[in-house]
Amino acid sequence: MQLQGKDKKVHFIGIGGAGMSGIATVMLEMGGYQVSGSDIKRSAVIDRLENLGAKCNIGHKTSNINNEIDAVVYSTAISPENPEILETQRLGIPLIRRGQMLARLMKEKKGIAVAGAHGKTTTTSMTALILEENSFDPTIIIGGDLSNIGGNAKLGQGEYMVAEADESDGSFLLLDPNIAVVTNIEDDHLDYYGTRENIAKAFRQFLAKLSAEGLAVICLDDPVLKEITTGLTCQVVTYGSLGSGADYQIKVLETRNGVNQGEVYFQEERLGMLELHVPGYHNLLNAMAAVAIGRHLNLDFEKIARALRKFTGAKRRFQVIGKVNGITVVDDYAHHPTEVKATLQAARTSHPGRIVTIFQPHRYSRTKQLFKEFGQSFTNGDLIILTDIYAASELPLEGVHTKLILDAIPLQEGQQVLYLPTLKDAADYLADYANPGDLVLTMGAGDVWTLGRELIKRLEEK
């Protein structure tokens, strides 16, 4: 179905979600669309969309769907039994996957798509900021809010679109970008892919879609990526750590005054210094992908570095929620062992005091597949608090419980691990036992982010 012409009516099921809201925002700003949507609860994102002209309903109901709607957009987070899905099918209204709609929007621009198991949102945000700060006026669709643009999306008048490419359900294969980034490949979303080999095959297909004039930006620190990029017909530029053999290499320097620093080299030529106000080696690597794109678009390194100095992070990516009574509260989306390990490493390098981490496992399937790896990822935590699993759209699996992760943690001297089932239990405990000098770090892809706000409130009331 071609969504062209005046006042086409498009309905989004789960419009407040990170990926859905970005697409809805761009369509609202384009004009020519009447956008409606539904979500299970009101949020700042819903308020923002309504201010742009969207009609949003709270709750998924059959009555939200009618014959005047031209198309309904949904994501894999929406159950096939959702009443709005069923009503859409009954009325014969076209159902469009979120990835299909993103692909349609990208066809109107020169697409820059960022894929990978980890670092997508940050790398997309950094790339978007570089283009935004250097007058490219890109269209942007990100999986997290970027303070520099006041949200997670914007319609630009320039020729480029920068977007996050979601591999979780294979929908990134619908995209036809001009530039594609792959940050890394991991054993994630095995509920969809089945095997690691299938994951690697999908990323290979993603890169193989690039034309001869296209550009693949690849992290050479990932051994799987080294293998799957062989024989690509597009242009390939690589980035990685010092000594990796990549085109762009980063020499990590000591963090000073909270500034994450590194020297950037291109084929052994020193380009200059990179300074980031977000911690962690993984963020320096993310920045290297953005540097490679900026240079491909003929930007001087100093202009790129200047833009990145303004980067303060994306929402829920090592986001400082607040500081009260000497206690710093930070929130991060980390929900895979590699992300948990990298986030705690960033916390350790940037914070001299005790690190208290609250981790909410996300999905029963992921916990079952990776509980041993999760157990090994908490090395840099001093006090580790584990809560019950956030189910997302899954049903419980027999024998799968947070205790699997707890039992897999090899306790080090001075480390303490607690199981506190609910976020309220964790908030009650931390309100009494968090100390001045602590960094309290909430991690997970569920609703654990609410804990940081609640803790700040409790500490302010003390």
Swiss-Prot record:
Reaction(s) catalysed by this chain's protein: UDP-N-acetyl-alpha-D-muramate + L-alanine + ATP = UDP-N-acetyl-alpha-D-muramoyl-L-alanine + ADP + phosphate + H(+)
A GO term, aspect molecular function: UDP-N-acetylmuramate-L-alanine ligase activity
Entry's localization field: Cytoplasm
EC id: 6.3.2.8
Superkingdom, taxonomy of origin: Bacteria
Pathway(s) per entry: Cell wall biogenesis; peptidoglycan biosynthesis
GO biological process: one example: peptidoglycan biosynthetic process
Disulphide bonds in the chain: none
Gene3D superfamilies on file: Mur ligase, C-terminal domain, Mur-like, catalytic domain, NAD(P)-binding Rossmann-like Domain
Family: Belongs to the MurCDEF family.
Function, as annotated: Cell wall formation.
Protein name (database record): UDP-N-acetylmuramate--L-alanine ligase
